[in-house]
């Protein structure tokens, strides 16, 4: 028992439990000046926005400090990565401190748009100045987003899982309830529920198999005897991007709708905003096309974020490693990028089929939205659990050895 209490996993897990408690506590801190008895609490915000917010650490249905969640930060990270791909921008050459500061500026801009859209849509109590209520709630929502970013950083440093744990907590707390409400609302019988469970387990099995699949590139190390060469290789996942495209695509695609809702509230006479808000609502044809295109693009982009040929080639050159029949340096970088590109396309197609394909059912009935996202959630869950498992395995590696005089 003493050994367990002193283990690094237990200590880090204790910190993570504390951070999750703080997150749950903040999720129950309701924003001020809101008329909770109003029949249309979300105002211009659709239920689909509330649902997608729950997948990114937010909860619009509770009108709490963390209603916007980590969505602005996630959107800022993917936009920054896209900007950094261009060598002409020079963003990747900036000092880390400046990069982090500009990422926070971008996060603030996106958080301002989303928080203002939410605040303007909420019904205000009678007798409260509307301007004061909107300003206060906007500031609180932005502060809530940055607090979650800070909490995620603390969890990365002291706990287990980083921001992944916050997202998992949000999904576990909100999505089962919303899926249950969908089943009740659609009057789905027991046979269909059992079929959905079986299909869900099948999707989970496929997701786990694909998550563990690897392509191994043989690596040779200078001054290492050849009989050890079988243990030297570079792993490339079958889906190098993992489940990240699904999560980030939802965050990225929701930004235009927040922006349009904000324009509609500020300029109610513009008729075109209603048309585009309706077109970009989750489950509509234009949204589905945009979502699947973003899924595919992010599937390729994140593959090169996770497996960078340039960084690996530079690290191999410094450590005296090389790939058989490939010259070190630029040739190694091009070879690795070529391999990654092949699997990135395979992974992007797999992600579109697994996460985007089932959502085509909402064209028949939009009320199937929550159920159609179950396969995508399995992709996220499998990736999250695998990452946490790898992190725990790395932390317990040193503890698996015994001291010489123990």
From Swiss-Prot:
Pfam families: SecY. It is a multi-pass membrane protein. The chain crosses the membrane at residues 14-34, 63-83, 108-128, 131-151, 156-176, 190-210, 246-266, 285-305, 344-364, 368-388. SUPFAM superfamilies: Preprotein translocase SecY subunit. Disulfide bonds: none annotated. GO terms for cellular component: plasma membrane. The keyword Protein transport applies. Part of the accessory SecA2/SecY2 system specifically required for export of possible cell wall proteins. The central subunit of a protein translocation channel. HAMAP family: SecY2. This is Accessory Sec system protein translocase subunit SecY2.
